[in-house]
From Swiss-Prot:
Keywords: Calcium, Cell adhesion, Disulfide bond, EGF-like domain, Glycoprotein, Heparin-binding, Repeat, Signal
Domain TSP type-1: 381-431, 437-492, 494-549
Cysteines joined through disulfide linkages: 393-425, 397-430, 408-415, 449-486, 453-491, 464-476, 506-543, 510-548, 521-533, 553-564, 558-574, 577-588, 594-610, 601-619, 622-646, 652-665, 659-678, 680-691, 707-715, 720-740, 756-776, 779-799, 815-835, 838-858, 876-896, 912-932, 948-1169
TSP type-3 repeat copies, ranges: 693-728, 729-764, 765-787, 788-823, 824-846, 847-884, 885-920, 921-956
MF annotations from Gene Ontology: calcium ion binding; heparin binding
InterPro entries: ConA-like_dom_sf (IPR013320), EGF-like_Ca-bd_dom (IPR001881), EGF-like_dom (IPR000742), EGF_dom (IPR024731), Thrombospondin_3-like_rpt (IPR003367), Thrombospondin_3_rpt (IPR017897), Thrombospondin_C (IPR008859), TSP1_rpt (IPR000884)
Name of the protein in question: Thrombospondin-2
Sequence ranges assigned to domain TSP C-terminal in this UniProt record: 960-1172
Carbohydrate attachment residues: 151, 316, 330, 457, 584, 710, 1069
Biased composition, class Acidic residues, residue ranges: 739-749, 847-866, 896-905
Lineage per the UniProt record: Eukaryota, Metazoa, Chordata, Craniata, Vertebrata
Signal peptide: 1-18
Polar residues composition bias: residue spans: 870-884
Length: 1172
């Protein structure tokens, strides 16, 4: 009370603090930014403090900013406390450069300040902007970017910028401007670890990142366990001592008294000594002033001591007395131009102003200013080097420019004037001609027909003169001449005689008779006004004019055509029967050449196509859709030499198809009608008969095409011509596809914010807060953002009492997600046979570590034929048949079954190998049975539309049902791929920046062609995407993967992984299965023992480009090990592996692959079974 009364007597009371009182003085930046383990792109790790998570950021565009309320409080505290302190525990990647803290705004590309750890320069940079001008302070030799944990404290307070690591001061400089007083909140955002560009994002781990507002750095260090040293009480004037401790910024090592020289030659220049003397003069003035101030303090202390009768002890009030004035606790005042003081717990703590190094050689002191200053005239060259020589002229002809430059010695001068000068130069006129490619002129009119009757030709020409190629320009492409047929009236055809028929038998055998022969006017018949044949139709001739002998042969005892031999005694004998007959010469019967020589005519395993005649034979014409000869003859010699050859017609090979010039003719086989189909080439779309440009390679043309009647398939204009969307979904029917429509349902809410993108709901009600609007939520009162509906009844699984719709409630259903009304459970493990991955072995946990759909309990991985099915579950254990096709369901696969349809007709003679038809009916005789005509596997899908015509289990490309296989399923954070299904499973979009994973379909293949369109719809990230084939388990598969840029994987354990840009083809045969070993091996371009082997990598190392459509095509023939990968960019082949041979796996499943890449479109997917 006495001390308070004394103060009141002096007229000094406690002073009210100015400004609003802010309770919180420490802010956890992770907490107020809502950064947690669920934040996309933030991976959680264990740091030095086990109770608090550490984070590594890999997707900086997803880092949330500090919330607005807390940012407002931070800015107010920074102004009130004259700055702030940033504390953190960090482990920065070696030699990396990264931002610790940044305040962006108020504009989209503006910043107010940022703290950047510059590993290459080994500095900690503070950049801030005042009135649009950038200022930079940096602390040197900080040693932060060495991949070691550091506990740092950054001081940005009053006029000081310093760094403490642990309890040690590393470096400190003086701030030029109190920028923290001008910070703005409106339209501003504060981020942790996020830089202004990709190169300035923080690379490493962060923990315990706080903004602290304290009175001094000692308060913060003491809370970290640091011991107080004398440095904490520097510049303190105590009431109990008359000694002033100078700060380390003021050195007293230099003595100006006369001393003996330590060496004969001075190592300092006169200019340096002059600067030193100027600084000492200023220091002398400062020390004298401080000495006088100390004397006044001692006098004032003595006065107060006498006034109050000795030191008082009080707990309620503290104050300081200086030069007769009493100052309240924490009050700050100015002593002189170089000194400020603050009252701290009865002590007066004074701080010296530290001057920045002079920027000129001869600084001067100004009255009232603490620090020396520099002045320059505007036209002075002080500090500049001499001008360099002029550069060469920037052009080789015409008017150009030259430049020269000079440099500034910034260590001691502030140079005025430009550093670069520019002047114009001229080297004569330029040749105005330009390189010009040739162009065709218009076509000339068609010439007259080359004939006056019948079929001829007309011709037209064009010249390469519009313009003529010059200066190395290219010649015109294409032909300068074009010809087409012309039709005139048919020409007259004069009739001509056929050959004479054989002479008829003579009317008598001797003494003269008559024989005749005839001819017909049909070779050709007269047509179109032609002349008739001239001459007689019949001709007669005398025969057997000789006298009649007495001869036994005169009575013609032999078979006509057989030679008769007579003898003098009147007897006779007959020679052999004529060709085409069998007998003794007297009696001859027709020889059936068709029965003796069975392969005369082409056979289709049906009725004989050879017709026996009397005499001779002939073959029926070739069956429909075959072409060949039609032989005929008499006798065995003709039968053995004249064979009928019928070959299947192939319009693609014969060039008789009607496909467009930019389409490919695909031969379907002679059993199909039609025998071919037309598909537009890559870069084009249409029905094959008409093809147009297709920029995004999704199978739809840029413009409408005039296709054949009722043939609108892929002839309609693409509703998203620059973004692949093979399904062409357009919910609001506005002509803009959903893929590129910003508001699919036209409810005035953009798709990005719409919680029902495909349903009009402007009110956006969402009762269960699952980000799916009530109008389209299949469980509107139950949180279920995935919207899974197993039985497709409109009620989501999350709120359905019977998920699979088998009339068995979930709590009693042993297969709640698989329809099984019988609830059969052979092994009694509580899991129904329909969904049990070991139906004959008790395994209630259903663990399947290798993701091959066989539970670990019964998985032995013994597979002698490498087709992905272990021996005890393989229906052909010794013959590779990945598809396990068994069309007669007899337990024996078609690959090892001699009668696939069990109709009693062996496969090699069965005209419908997969369909039961013991009668083998074949109406048109083409070798294909009627029952499987145009649908070989009898799956009700015509072969021309069937992607697997010989497998009734696969009819179309469909990835709507797939198995999600995470390849690195463990870790502190796990981001799985997010697959969006479109176009009935023919288009999938992966939206997340995820860990490696596969979406693998359930259809299984041996020989297969697999193609699709690849498109990355973002400019964020640059990592892997591709597809898999021959998938047998998560340890055994082939993968084609494509990286945009070369990059080392950020986790170097368990093995360092270097990923090179370009397309790679790899075979995975992992001994460890999914996890970090397989993850790093997949990233690595090369071989990793026991994990991955690279079969091919594109030597051009071409990475994919953002917003660019590519088309891949895979060919795989497991029987020979042949595989080939082609990648098109537009119409051109960008990468081609050529023939690659590997027989590690004999087939498997197909799927899509991603590794740390978001917004990947897999569009217009297509797989087709092929003959081995």
């Amino acid at each position: 009370m006495l001390w308070a009364l004394a103060l009141l007597a002096l007229g000094i009371g406690p002073r009210a603090s100015a400004g609003d009182h802010v309770k919180d003085t420490s802010f956890d930046l992770f907490s107020i930014s809502n950064i947690n383990r669920k934040t996309i792109g933030a991976k959680q790790f264990r740091g030095p403090d086990p109770g608090v998570p550490a984070y590594r950021f890999v997707r900086f565009d997803y880092i949330p900013p500090v919330n607005t309320d807390d940012l407002n409080r931070i800015v107010k505290l920074a102004r009130r406390k004259e700055g702030f302190f940033l504390t953190a525990q960090l482990k920065q990647d070696r030699k990396s450069r990264g931002t610790l803290l940044v305040l962006e705004g108020p504009g989209t590309s503006q910043r107010q300040f940022e703290i950047v750890s510059n590993g290459p320069g080994d500095t900690l940079d503070l950049n801030y902007w005042v009135e649009g001008n950038q200022h930079t302070n940096f602390l040197e030799d900080v040693g932060l970017a060495d991949s070691q944990w550091k506990n740092v404290t950054v001081q940005v307070a009053s006029d000081t910028y310093s760094l403490y690591v642990g309890c040690d001061l590393i470096d400190s400089v003086t701030l030029e401007e109190p920028f923290y007083e001008q910070l703005e909140v409106d339209r501003s955002r504060m981020y942790v670890a996020k830089g202004a560009s990709r190169e300035s994002h923080f690379r490493g781990l962060l923990q315990n990142v706080h903004l602290v507002f304290a009175d001094s750095v000692e308060d913060i260090l003491s809370k970290k366990g640091c011991q107080h040293s004398q440095g904490a009480e520097v510049n303190t004037i105590s009431e109990h001592t008359e000694t002033l401790h100078l700060s380390p910024h003021i050195t007293t090592d230099l003595v100006v008294q006369g001393v003996e020289k330590a060496q004969e030659v001075c190592t300092h220049s006169c200019e340096e000594l002059s600067n030193m003397m100027n600084e000492l003069s200023g220091l002398h003035v400062m020390v004298n002033q401080l000495s006088k101030n100390l004397e006044r303090v001692s006098s004032d202390n003595q006065f107060l001591l006498e006034l109050i009768g000795g030191p008082l002890k009080t707990r309620n009030m503290s104050a300081c007395v200086q030069e007769g004035r009493i100052f309240a606790e924490n009050e700050t005042w100015v002593v002189d131009s170089c000194t400020t003081c603050t009252c701290k717990k009865f002590k007066t703590v004074c701080h010296q102003i530290t001057c920045s190094p002079a920027t000129c050689a001869n600084p001067s002191f100004v009255e009232g200013e603490c620090c020396p200053s520099c002045s320059h005239s505007a036209d002075s060259d002080e500090g500049w080097s001499p001008w360099a020589e002029w550069t060469e002229c920037s052009v080789t002809c015409g008017s150009g420019t030259q430049q020269r430059g000079r440099s500034c010695d910034v260590t001691s001068n502030t140079c005025l004037g430009p550093s670069i000068q520019t002047r114009t130069c001229s080297l004569g006129k330029c040749d105005t001609r330009i390189r010009q490619n040739g162009g065709w002129s218009h076509w000339s009119p068609w010439s007259s027909c080359s004939v006056t009757c019948g079929v001829g030709n007309v011709t037209r020409i064009r010249l390469c003169n519009s313009p003529v190629p010059q200066m190395g320009g290219k010649n015109c492409k294409g032909s300068g001449r074009e010809t087409k047929p012309c039709q005139r009236d048919p020409c007259p055809i004069d009739g001509r005689w056929s050959p004479w028929s054989p002479w008829s038998a003579c009317t008598v055998t001797c003494a003269g008779g008559i024989r005749e022969r005839s001819r017909v006017c049909n070779s050709p018949e007269p047509q179109y006004g032609g002349k008739d044949c001239v001459g007689d139709v019949t001709e007669h001739q005398m025969c057997n004019k000789r006298s009649c002998p007495i001869d036994g042969c005169l009575s013609n005892p032999c078979f006509p055509g057989a030679k008769c031999n007579s003898f003098p005694d009147g007897s006779w004998s007959c020679g052999s029967c004529p060709v085409g007959f069998l007998g003794n010469g007297t009696h001859c019967e027709d020889l059936d050449e068709c029965a003796v020589v069975t392969d005369i005519c082409f056979s289709t395993n049906k009725a004989p196509r050879c017709v026996n005649t009397n005499p001779g034979f002939h073959c029926l014409p070739c069956p429909p859709r075959y072409k060949g000869n039609q032989p005929f003859g008499v006798g065995l010699e003709d039968a053995r030499t004249e064979k009928q050859v019928c070959e299947p017609e192939n319009p693609c090979k014969d060039k008789t198809h009607s496909c467009h010039k930019n389409a490919e003719c695909i031969y379907l086989g002679h059993f199909s009608d039609p025998m071919y189909k037309c598909e537009c080439q890559i870069g084009y779309a249409g029905d094959g008969l008409i093809c147009g440009e297709d920029s995004d390679l999704d199978g739809w043309p840029n413009n409408n095409l005039v296709c054949a009647t009722n043939a609108t398939y892929h002839c309609i204009k693409d509703n998203c011509p620059k973004l692949p969307n093979s399904g062409q979904e357009d919910f609001d029917k506005d002509g803009i596809g959903d893929a590129c429509d910003e508001d699919d349902d036209n409810d005035g809410v953009s798709d990005e914010k719409d919680n029902c993108q495909l349903l009009f709901n402007p009110r956006q009600l969402d009762y269960d807060k699952d980000e799916v609007g009530d109008r389209c939520d299949n469980c509107p009162y139950v949180h279920n953002p995935a919207q899974i509906d197993t039985d497709n009844n409109g009620e989501g699984d999350a709120c359905s009492v019977d998920i699979d719709g088998d009339d068995v409630f979930n709590e009693r259903d042993n297969c709640p997600y698989v329809y099984n009304t019988d609830q059969r459970d052979t092994d009694g493990d509580g899991v129904g046979d329909h969904c049990d991955n070991c139906p004959l072995m008790h395994n209630p946990d259903q663990i399947d570590q290798d993701n091959d759909l066989v539970g670990d309990q019964c998985d032995n991985n013994e597979d002698i034929d490498d087709d992905g099915h272990q021996n005890n579950q393989d229906n052909c254990p010794y013959i590779s048949n990945s598809n396990q096709a068994d069309h007669d369901n007899d337990g024996k696969g078609d690959a090892c079954d001699s009668d696939d349809d069990n109709d009693g007709v062996p496969d090699d003679r069965d005209n419908c190998r997969l369909v039961f038809n013991p009668d083998q009916e074949d109406s048109d005789g083409d070798g294909r049975g009627d029952i499987c005509k145009d649908d070989f596997d009898n799956d009700n899908v015509p072969d021309i539309d069937d992607v697997c015509p010989e497998n009734n289990a696969i009819t179309e490309t469909d990835f709507r049902n797939f198995q999600m296989v995470p390849l690195d399923p463990k870790g502190t954070t796990q981001i799985d791929p997010n697959w969006v299904i479109r176009h009935q499973g023919k288009e999938l979009v992966q939206t997340a920046n995820s860990d490696p994973g596969i979406a693998v379909g359930f259809d299984e293949f041996g020989s297969v062609d697999f193609s699709g369109t690849f498109y990355v719809n973002t400019d964020r990230d640059d990592d892997y995407a591709g597809f898999v084939f021959g998938y047998q388990s998560s340890s055994r598969f082939y993968v084609v993967m494509w990286k945009q840029v070369t990059q080392t994987y950020w986790e170097d354990k368990p093995s360092r992984a270097y990923g090179y840009s370009g397309v790679s083809l790899k075979v995975v045969n992992s001994t460890t299965g999914t996890g970090e070993h397989l993850r790093n091996a997949l990233w690595h371009t090369g071989n990793t023992e026991g994990q991955v082997r690279t079969l091919w990598h594109d030597p051009k190392n071409i990475g994919w480009k953002d917003y660019t459509a590519y088309r891949w095509h895979l060919i795989h023939r497991p029987k020979t090990g042949y595989m080939r990968v082609l990648v098109h960019e537009g119409k051109q082949v960008m990468a081609d592996s050529g023939p690659i041979y590997d027989q590690t796996y004999a087939g498997g499943r197909l799927g899509l692959f991603v590794f740390s890449q978001e917004m990947v479109y897999f569009s217009d997917l297509k797989y087709e079974c092929r003959d081995a």
